[in-house]
């Protein structure tokens, strides 16, 4: 097994016609109650937007899955999350979302790094999931 087998590092960004404040609110929504799979099905996520706040999936009837914790939050420019996320095996993840003003709006940059016994399917599809989330943030900001 190599280091590459045990890690991944995904970076994506998207520009949008929105203030950083509006984009940050949309990020919180899309990482929480507004998070969906690409087929539109809700992931039933909750995000407590405060240092140490939980990020978890609540399926009801006491069924759930801890995705992580808020490591840092500096609205409207930075959100960092860390934890197992969707990986039910030995792994740790760090997700960093940065928002900065640019001409005509703002840029949202996302970086997801992981280390552990990474499932090849997760490695293959994680970028698609983040692209879906970023597209929804942009749509939320530009349609309102």
Residue ranges and their predicted role:
Residues 7, 14-15, 25, 48-49, ...:
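Charge-dense, helix-prone N-terminal extensions
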Residues 23-27, 55, 70, 81, ...:
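Hydrophobic pocket/interface hotspot
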Residues 85-132:
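Beta-strand/loop substructures that line and gate deep hydrophobic ligand-binding cavities in soluble
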Residues 1-42:
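Hydrophobic ligand-binding cavity/cleft-lining segments
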Residues 12-14, 67-72, 93-101:
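Hydrophobic/aromatic beta-strand elements that line small-molecule binding cavities or substrate pockets
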Residues 44, 139-144:
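Short, highly charged C-terminal tails/helix-capping segments
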Residues 42-84:
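Glycine-rich portal/gate segments that line the openings of hydrophobic small-molecule binding cavities
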């Amino acid at each position: 097994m190599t280091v590459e087998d045990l890690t991944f590092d995904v970076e994506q960004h998207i520009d949008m016609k929105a203030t950083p404040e509006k984009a940050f609110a949309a990020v919180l929504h899309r990482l929480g109650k507004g998070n969906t799979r690409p087929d539109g099905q809700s992931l039933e996520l909750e995000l407590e937007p405060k240092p140490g706040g939980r990020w978890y999936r609540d399926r009801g009837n006491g069924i759930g899955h801890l995705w992580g914790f808020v490591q840092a939050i500096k609205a409207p420019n930075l959100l960092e999350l860390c934890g197992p996320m969707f990986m039910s095996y030995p792994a740790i993840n760090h997700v960093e979302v940065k928002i900065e003003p640019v001409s005509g709006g703002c840029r949202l940059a996302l970086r997801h790094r992981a280390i552990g016994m990474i499932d090849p399917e997760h490695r293959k599809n994680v970028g698609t999931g983040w692209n879906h989330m970023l597209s929804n943030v942009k749509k939320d900001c530009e349609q309102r």
